[in-house]
Amino acid sequence: MDFHLTEGQVTVRELAGGVFGRHGDAQHLAEVEAGEDRFDRRLWRDLADAGVLGLTVPAEYDGAGLGLSEVALALTEQGRRVCLVPLWETVVLGALALVRYGTDKQRSTWLPRVADGSAVLAAALEDPGAGRPWAPRVRATGSDDGWTLTGTGTAVPYAHVADAVLVPASTEAGSVELFLVETGQAGVVRARYERTDRGVAADLVLDAAPAERLGDGLDEDRLDWLLQRAWVGLAAIQLGVSQESVRQTAGYLSQRHQFGVPLATFQAAAHQAANCHIDTQAMEVTFWNALWRLETGRPAAAAVHVAKWWSAEGGDRVARTVQHLHGGIGADVTYPIHRYMLWASQLANTLGSAGWHLHQIGRHIAGGTA
């Protein structure tokens, strides 16, 4: 088995890393966080110009026609630089679903705009009151005039700037389908608030809001298809966050002296840093296993939950440890390492906590599908 990236994947990683790197200095990140939208639109334009936003968009819609692996590499680079742009939301949650399930009209309407950066997409996949993401509380009502949705999509990332949001909803027939809701319509209210990572999310309050069903509908298996890719995308970002925070901490421990010697020579500090490295290695191998299974059509459900569990558990542990290893300066909320802790905490609890995913792993073990 060849574990090396292809030449094309290396190119994507280097391209995305270069673009994010030009916008990832601490001063610029702080300026974006102080802005009204918490959305780096200059970076978004550069990502579009570089072709990163069109990675999964088919060539006939002005994209590169690549897969989830290439997007995951770009997401990892975003995590390294903790840049506030809706790459996961637009490309994974939005474009992938449109490519897979959208009608020709839906694809021609949205995919070229995704590729050129003129459209932002999001998805309302958080539904804490439902107990499980496969049973959404938003209700869809069909009529001769089309579909309308009523209910609230909770904590929708970047909904405040999204042109359209994908919303899973339960129909009167008892099925679960995915709908596309344009945010500028009547019956749509966005109640925004700041997230832990200093970005912005919004509750999407729908009151008989006009909606368009995605393709021919979305049953539970198809919703699971989208959720699995969403979880792997989150694991990709968290991997970048953790790897970069460990790298920065290693540099700090080597440069910072105490009692005339580098902190890295202290066994207690070295052991904690080594544990962080082990966590990131476990995060990486489980992430790639889940991604490989998804890309090759193998059973992936249990592997995806394992990857997301490591992303949540390991990522949060790494974030808190590296902040502790920075000593007093780690408590400074303006110091760069603090931003990585905030991102790790946000990612760890997005679309299910470590405990929730551990429960799903247990279900797969008990059911013989792990």
Model-derived segments and spans:
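A short core secondary-structure module
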Residues: A124, T152-V188
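Glycine-rich phosphate/cofactor-binding loops in nucleotide/flavin-utilizing enzymes
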Residues: D2, V12-R13, G328-A370
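N-terminal glycine-rich flavin-associated loop
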Residues: V85-D104
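A structural signal for short hydrophobic beta-strand segments in well-ordered beta-sheet cores
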Residues: V138-G142
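C-terminal helix-coil-helix/basic helical segment that borders enzyme active sites and/or dimer interfaces
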Residues: Q27-G35, A250, S254-P262, H277-W310, ...
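Amphipathic, small/basic residue-rich leader segments at the start of a protein or domain
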Residues: M1-V85, R363-A370
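A short, Trp-centered hydrophobic/proline-enriched beta-strand micro-motif
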Residues: G117-P128
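Glycine-rich beta->alpha junctions and the first turn(s) of the following alpha-helix
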Residues: D2-E14, R80, V188-Q281
